[in-house]
Regions:
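Active-site acidic/histidine proton-transfer and metal-coordination neighborhood
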Residues: 1-38, 48
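Alpha-helical structural signal in soluble globular domains
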Residues: 2, 27-32, 69, 132-136, ...
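Hydrophobic faces of well-ordered beta-strands that scaffold small-molecule active sites
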Residues: 7-9, 37-42, 78-82, 140-145
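Active-site-proximal loop/turn and secondary-structure-junction residues that shape catalytic pockets
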Residues: 11-15, 43-47, 84-86, 148-150
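Short, surface-exposed amphipathic charged segments that create phosphate/polyanion-binding patches used
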Residues: 23-24, 96-97, 157-162
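Short active-site-adjacent structural elements
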Residues: 88-91, 150-154
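C-terminal helical cap(s) of enzyme catalytic domains, especially alpha/beta-barrels
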Residues: 151-170
Length: 170
């Protein structure tokens, strides 16, 4: 078949394509036999791999460090899901809790989703340093992947992140 679409694999924050081990990224990419394969870098997911991050500037530095560690493999990053989520303190607290999960499937599922949304918040970047991140990676596809509860909140968050991309400090 002569497919023309890009096949992009998104990094996650659980074992698999975490973008923290270049040898694993290389291994995964080598098993995909398609010319237009690549990576969709979710910045928030990569941030979850470092529980010590305290600021957006630290997060941008961390992401750039991980991209640099990938060397030539970084050229496979064709897209970005741009968002930030600095939740290491929450995760550290969660890890130490001994609370049992509900045994009822529906209640357990609800509890899991609540934790996931506390960890993976999809907030806008507000630091102008994010401009360097996007300029370094030069993605073909850039998605402002932001979570909101309505159109007006989404617009506010989008305006904030776009301002940061233009170098404005919020």
């Amino acid at each position: 078949e002569n497919y023309t679409f890009d096949f992009l694999m998104e990094n996650l924050w659980w074992p698999g394509l975490t973008m923290t081990r270049p040898e694993m990224t290389k291994r995964l990419l080598s098993q995909v036999h398609y010319q237009k394969k690549g990576i969709m870098l979710d910045t928030g997911h990569l941030m979850h791999m470092n529980l010590e991050l305290k600021t957006q500037d630290e997060a941008v530095d961390y992401i750039l460090e991980k991209v640099a560690e990938h060397g030539n493999l970084a050229s496979y990053i064709k897209g970005m899901h741009l968002n930030q989520s600095i939740t290491g303190a929450y995760v550290k607290t969660l890890i130490t809790k001994k609370d049992a999960m509900p045994s009822d499937y529906e209640a357990c599922s609800k509890a899991c989703y609540e934790h996931v949304f506390q960890i993976d918040q999809h907030l806008p970047f507000t630091t102008p340093k994010v401009q360097k991140l996007v300029e370094t990676i030069k993605p073909e596809y850039l998605t402002h992947e932001l979570m909101s509860y309505g159109r007006s909140e989404h617009e506010i968050k989008l305006v904030m992140q776009r301002a940061a991309l233009k170098g404005k400090n919020l």
